[in-house]
């Protein structure tokens, strides 16, 4: 695709500095851009523009006034990120589905209910009493087990499994190989054998939730495991049975949440956070990468480390730990001085006794 810079200025309502007939063929980040690219910089004042990029054109904040080398055409906008996303969308139009409607190579149970404009790809399997909302898209290899429901305009990518009686809301995205509603990891070991405990609950995923590839969300024992509206879940996240995840949480890659954890709204868990069972995480809390959370977390708290503690406390511990070798040397030196002083004192006391 080839687009004139003047057309991009019109698209973004930006101010153009430079050649309006400049031809742009692609969008690129600063470090990989070439003479066919348009790129962007949200903080251009931090860059040396003689070396920052080989792009032909740059999207910059409207407030930025420093002149760039003449080789750059410039597009000045109010919101750099939003403008560049609009330009990128122009160069990367969505591909049309390779299938439309219900493939005759998909299995759809006679008792299933399909909304208008549903797309079901070959080799998908739709079980008894399943309900699929209007405009939903199910790719190849998807399995929706009996009694489950998929909301309107939800996209389910290949090889996703939604177990029986689970509910997926509208406008959700389920990426490849995620599993919704597997049995929770609960066992009765009183007999000496590990006997699977009751797993009669379900999973309820509210609207506008995104679930990453290979993520797993277990069904509740008697009630539903709940994922709140607008929550975004990264790849390889594991959420155990009976959890209640609030609205608009961000759960980054490889987070593991044990059973019956409750989170408030707008909680952020960075990569590889681990949360023990039956804890409460308050709204707006941030759990730093690889935090091992062993106690309840208040709303708005920022915690890090293993075991996780408030960020400032953990930083003090890390500073002290970094100084530990030096501190050990000082302690050894002080101990040696003390021993020498005590020896001298003993010698003086012995001499004084002899004189008496």
Could you describe each region identified by the protein language model?
Residues 1-105, 117, 166, 171, ...:
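Terminal amphipathic alpha-helical/low-complexity segments used for targeting or macromolecular assembly
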Residues 40, 101-310, 315:
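Structural signal for interior beta-strand "rungs" in well-ordered beta-sheet cores
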